[in-house]
């Protein structure tokens, strides 16, 4: 592959710029429902929002209380965020006074045992989804599962792939070239993933109730009545306190090629876990988990980025990738942005565009175990002390200061921003905005959060509740068109009908037989 700056130059004509701008994006935003006192909602998913099993835009994640809003795929940043805003506005109007918790880390949970696991009806598909979540509860506890985040889906245009393929040696088929190039993007992303918690990490603090009873070596400082924080942390969500899986630490799944990745995932699905076997699979006639393997299903594999392809009915993610290769990637390292009603803002999306294009267009050597260890250490350093003055990160040849590394990255991104902007200024403005946070760590999202809590002496829970109320009013006042509202009404009804159809179609097959068929062997 040509050097990055040469590639940017190669795409500098109108046709090349159009190929770069043909990006497709989607956003998935998770948010807990809370009551007016700030406590986790314990009721079921609101019926007016439709079926969480079959609705394309409004579903649930781990819990009945953990809403997930999904945008359709979109070419335009503004319409992408408008669609996400409309989904929020419609949903809030059907929450009967409940609010959305606008940060990643949960707070007011009276009893972890009462966190309601998501339910999806009586079809075997729905029962399997609930049972998978029951397994997560037994394995890791419920509290960890209600940490919320934002996922960003990204793909580039066929025109860009054609141009890049023409520049390659064409030793691969076109489809294989696309998959291998996406894995090149993934490897470079993993080398630089620490950039995202540095800029966008927004969970340097949490309520002390979250770690009640947990052992931790982290030296928290206290603020307000019940706030714990680390002075230089960026994203406790991405730390060992958040969603990590010690059972997965030894999987060593390779991102060096699609075949190696698929082989690793398939091996993990079949790898037995002594710890999880102790839970039991079916005890006294009742399932506790889908199986006792390291991963119950592929979705349990934790990674800050995933290679994806839209699946056909009944198809596993790895089967879709094996069938037709990588279609898009899913970025999973984003905290909820508490300063945006929808958890993410346009300048973040544009930075992600630049960042991911850079990861794609930069040469990406294969990784080895020594590099993987460095990458893991760098990410851990940044999530726990990313704003620490003079922080050094590991490179192949020694160490480099985080700030120096970031400034070099921003310099590289600037030529791409100029090209994408053409006659406009949106990408350059986004880059300038976040460059300020490189120079002044207080301007990162985590820096801004700690200014609210520590400098102003606010309690974490109270501050988040005030934001929840503010955003609740924002969505109530949002000018949702009658056409948009009718469209959501119609999908709510059609999704419920689809669930009923699925339940009827699967009624003759027992859950045992369904799981045996799904896994190809007794669960």
Swiss-Prot record:
Taken from the UniProt entry, a GO cellular component term is: cytosol
Catalyzed reactions per annotation: L-cysteine + L-glutamate + ATP = gamma-L-glutamyl-L-cysteine + ADP + phosphate + H(+)
Q: Which cysteines are joined by disulfide bonds?
A: none
Q: GO terms for molecular function, please?
A: ATP binding; glutamate-cysteine ligase activity; metal ion binding
Identify the EC number(s).
6.3.2.2
UniProt keyword annotations, A-Z:
ATP-binding, Glutathione biosynthesis, Ligase, Nucleotide-binding
Electron transport listed as a keyword: no
Q: Which pathway does the database say it acts in? A: Sulfur metabolism; glutathione biosynthesis; glutathione from L-cysteine and L-glutamate: step 1/2
Task: Tell me the domain of life.
Answer: Bacteria
Signal sequence, renumbered to the chain: none
The record ties this protein, via PANTHER family, to: GLUTAMATE--CYSTEINE LIGASE
| Full protein name | Glutamate--cysteine ligase
Q: Which organism is it from?
A: Shewanella oneidensis (strain ATCC 700550 / JCM 31522 / CIP 106686 / LMG 19005 / NCIMB 14063 / MR-1)
- What is the organism lineage in this UniProt record? Bacteria, Pseudomonadati, Pseudomonadota, Gammaproteobacteria, Alteromonadales
């Amino acid at each position: 592959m040509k050097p990055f700056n040469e590639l940017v130059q190669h795409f500098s004509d109108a046709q090349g710029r159009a190929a770069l701008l043909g990006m497709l994006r989607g956003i998935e935003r998770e948010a807990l429902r809370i009551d007016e006192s700030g406590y986790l909602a314990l009721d079921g998913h609101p019926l007016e929002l439709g079926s969480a099993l079959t609705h394309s835009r409004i579903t649930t994640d781990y819990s009945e209380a953990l809403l997930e809003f999904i945008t359709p795929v979109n070419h335009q940043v503004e319409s992408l965020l408008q669609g996400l805003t409309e989904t929020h506005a419609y949903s809030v109007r059907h929450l009967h006074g409940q609010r959305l918790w606008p940060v990643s880390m949960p707070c007011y949970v009276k009893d972890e045992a009462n966190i309601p696991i998501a339910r999806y009806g009586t079809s075997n598909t729905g029962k399997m989804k609930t049972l998978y979540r029951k397994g997560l509860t037994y394995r890791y506890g419920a509290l960890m599962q209600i940490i919320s985040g934002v996922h960003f889906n990204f793909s580039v245009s066929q025109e860009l792939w054609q141009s890049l393929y023409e520049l390659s040696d064409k030793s691969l088929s076109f489809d294989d070239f696309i998959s291998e190039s996406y894995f090149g993007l993934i490897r470079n992303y993993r080398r630089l993933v620490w950039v995202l918690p540095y800029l966008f990490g927004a969970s340097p603090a949490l309520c002390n109730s979250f770690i009640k009873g947990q052992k931790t070596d982290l030296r928290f400082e206290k603020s307000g009545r019940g706030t714990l924080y680390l002075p230089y942390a960026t994203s406790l969500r991405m730390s060992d306190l958040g969603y990590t899986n010690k059972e997965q630490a030894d999987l060593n799944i390779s991102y060096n090629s699609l075949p190696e990745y698929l082989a690793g995932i398939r091996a993990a699905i079949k790898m037995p876990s002594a710890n999880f076997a102790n839970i039991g699979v079916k005890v006294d006639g009742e399932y506790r988990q889908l199986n006792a393997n390291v991963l119950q299903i592929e979705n349990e594999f934790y990674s800050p980025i995933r290679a994806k392809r839209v699946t056909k009915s009944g198809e596993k993610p790895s089967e879709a990738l094996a069938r037709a290769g990588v279609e898009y990637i899913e970025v999973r390292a984003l905290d909820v942005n508490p300063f945006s009603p929808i958890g993410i803002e346009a300048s973040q999306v544009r930075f992600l565009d630049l960042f991911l294009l850079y990861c794609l267009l930069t040469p990406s050597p294969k990784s080895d175990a020594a590099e993987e260890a460095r990458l893991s250490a760098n990410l851990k350093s940044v999530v726990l002390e990313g704003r620490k003055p003079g922080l050094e990160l590991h490179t192949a040849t020694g160490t480099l200061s985080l700030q120096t590394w970031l400034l070099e990255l921003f310099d590289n991104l600037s030529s791409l921003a100029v090209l994408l902007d053409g006659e406009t200024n949106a990408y350059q403005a986004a880059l300038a905005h976040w460059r300020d946070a490189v120079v002044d760590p207080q301007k990162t999202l985590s820096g801004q959060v700690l200014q609210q809590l520590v400098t102003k002496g606010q309690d974490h829970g109270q501050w988040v509740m005030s934001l929840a109320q503010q955003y609740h009013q924002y969505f109530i006042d949002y000018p949702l068109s009658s056409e948009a509202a009718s469209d959501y009404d119609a999908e709510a009804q059609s999704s419920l009908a689809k669930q009923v159809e699925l339940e009827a179609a699967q009624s003759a097959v027992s859950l045992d037989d369904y799981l045996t068929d799904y896994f190809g062997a007794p669960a």
